[in-house]
Amino acid sequence: MAARIGIFSVFVAVLLSISAFSSAQDLQIVNAERRIDLSSHIVKAFLTLKVENIGKDPAAEMLLAFPPTQIKNLAMVQALATTGKKKKKTYLPLDVKPTEQPDAPNDTGYYRVTFISPLGPGETVSLEVLYILTHSLEPFPVEITQSESQLVYYHDSAVILSPYHVKQQTTFIKTPSTRVESFTSIEPANRAGKEIKYGPYENRASYSYTPVIIHFENNSPFAVVEELVREIEISHWGSLQITENYRLTHGGARHKGVFSRVDYQSKRSVSGASSFNALLAVLPPRVNSVYYRDEIGNISTSHLRTGFRKSELEFEPRYPLFGGWSATFIIGYRVPLEDYLFEASDGRRYLNFTFGCPLVETIVNKLTIKVVLPEGSKDPSAVLPFTVNQELQVKYSYLDIVGRTVVVLQKDNVVPTHNVPFQVYYTFKPIYMLAEPFMLVSAFFLVFVASLAYVHIDLNIVRK
């Protein structure tokens, strides 16, 4: 705890020294409102900005700054330009990309937001920014018994970190319950129920930073998938086979002492409040042949609900998960090929499927998606709305001659917001669909010829 406060102090000192001799900015933030949701272990922050160009030249972009304690846990940043008011408000997505600044103070991280059109001198633009943080709630105490609730720390700043002068700003922090052990008070600040309000603060210089710490109760399931490998195998004969291998852990306060299943079943509201014994996976519609198993075998404690827009699989591991406990399991299912495989205007075929993890409110530390293309596929390419690591592999299956091309997509720090469609394009000649049937027919024909020859060949040494 003292070490964290020391790091914050050094960070603030460096920011003040940098801002003292920063050059004048062409932009300023007229008003900023930030709302931070701490209801689950995935921290969501909604930032509303009104930006003004106070320079003499048009501005085509602006910077969003994040402290080093957040940049390493930043899962996603999105920005929208807004026009109109209330029901007539329209939203236009903006291009947001990570960037580096040579004079960044103390490892501050930046994202560059490009405006739809350059912002002229004296003009203003309204933006709405969403950024998501993972692993930002620190359990304290770090170990709890089965009967104790989970308390966590959240570290942030009462004012937003920005390379621009901020005329007025307010921060609202929402906790999951009214139990708040303590919070840093930076006047004006007040707390009402589940909400803590910091501000309004006026005329804060660039790179202002006022650290705050909130200690509160959070018993939401800290479900963390250490590694998820999803294999999507395309068969032009009628279906997609999806196999998902999970290595799941509870990322909250570690469990100490003995586990009593009797207390867990009879006193569910107070025993193991931060544990979880069931998970919900949102699967595509029209799924079939669904199975759920672990190292021991199939698990029957699952319920599948199918619908027109989605399917939901609710299942229970063999034992409830407390802090520090882990479980490994596999989910598999099939979906109709015609729902996800299409033909582009240039003749190429492409798979349109959902990226991310089907489990609700789950962090995935490492996600690997393997798209297994039919044998004979060429020129594969993947299209995604964000950056991922890509590579090609080869997989051999039954009756394969040259193997099947596998498009491998890998991304770290994945959250539910990443569950968006992606496409994999490839070229395929229909003649290749006859390769495996031809091999089977050829094999049966050779066996038939060999059998026929064996019957008619005389192997006797002496002629009868």
Swiss-Prot record:
Cytoplasmic side: 458-464
Glycosylation sites: 106, 298, 352
Record's function text: Subunit of the oligosaccharyl transferase (OST) complex that catalyzes the initial transfer of a defined glycan (Glc(3)Man(9)GlcNAc(2) in eukaryotes) from the lipid carrier dolichol-pyrophosphate to an asparagine residue within an Asn-X-Ser/Thr consensus motif in nascent polypeptide chains, the first step in protein N-glycosylation. N-glycosylation occurs cotranslationally and the complex associates with the Sec61 complex at the channel-forming translocon complex that mediates protein translocation across the endoplasmic reticulum (ER). All subunits are required for a maximal enzyme activity.
Summary of subunit composition and partner proteins: Component of the oligosaccharyltransferase (OST) complex.
Cross-link (Glycyl lysine isopeptide (Lys-Gly) (interchain with G-Cter in ubiquitin)) at residue(s): 310
Main localization, broad class: endoplasmic reticulum
Compartments (UniProt record): Endoplasmic reticulum membrane
GO cellular component term of the entry, any: plant-type cell wall
Protein encoded by which gene: OST1B
Keywords from the named record: Endoplasmic reticulum, Glycoprotein, Isopeptide bond, Membrane, Signal, Transmembrane, Transmembrane helix, Ubl conjugation
Pathway assigned to this chain's UniProt record: Protein modification; protein glycosylation
Record keyword Transmembrane helix present: yes
Name of the protein: Dolichyl-diphosphooligosaccharide--protein glycosyltransferase subunit 1B
Organism this protein belongs to: Arabidopsis thaliana (Mouse-ear cress)
GO biological process, one term: protein N-linked glycosylation
Transmembrane segments: 437-457
